[in-house]
Amino acid sequence: MCIRDSHKVIKANNFKGNYIHYGVREHAMCAVMNGIALHSNLKPYGGTFLIFSDYCKPAIRLAALMKIGVIFVLSHDSIGLGEDGPTHQPVEQLSGLRSIPNLNVFRPADTTEVAECWQIALQNNQTPSVIALTRQRVSPIRKQFTEQNYCESGAYEIMRTGNDIKCTILASGSEVGLAIEVGHKLATRNIYSKVISVPCLDIFEKNSEEIKSKILDETNIIFSIEAAKTDSWGKYVGKKGKSFGVDDFGKSAPYKEIFNDFNLKGDEISNSISGIIND
């Protein structure tokens, strides 16, 4: 899944290539990449579905422990996978990967964030990276490229709907677009918010308390939106806020229907936030 036209496949009788067909061998793939990184100055990367990171976990953990900058590209990162159903829809995997010390778990929102997260991963030689990507198409969140890498702080403000801010909405990946939709819906009720894209919680946590507090604006009620288990966000939303996510196994259906079944839709979330703020 990571192959390009410029790549040449390594074969039994020809080792001059730069691409390995591992087959359905996720653990072996990640372990081999660790070996390549330890043996040379090469920067290996390989890909599989996020759900299969469970097969890769020992090798990913060792990459973090050994401080080598391997890049693990993990696609189909949520219930957005759709009809393949709960066996292939990751729910708890992001939380598990985020719990590994010295591992950066990136979940970019669009192509611009993908490029920025990729740059960070390439430049980091002592911390391995997971780059979690969607299956479904997502609309561009940032329409213009800038020299500044906004993802390098782990989280940044991507929208605010007014001056009298009542809440902060955190989101990652494909749900950043949903958070923006929720922000606009709340604004029609005179509830103004700021939306924070959080491509990497691990990097965000390394900021000073002052910077984290400034980004979160902890004087507001904080909410989070992510199509995965919500336990990554509890420390931020606290008792006043709420996390919108997926705390059960998924379902087999078109992805939009599954998002609706888990109430991950603009109207439902904006109604819930409005009720909490006006309570």
Language-model features, listed with the residues they occupy:
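Thiamine diphosphate
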Residues: 4-279, ...
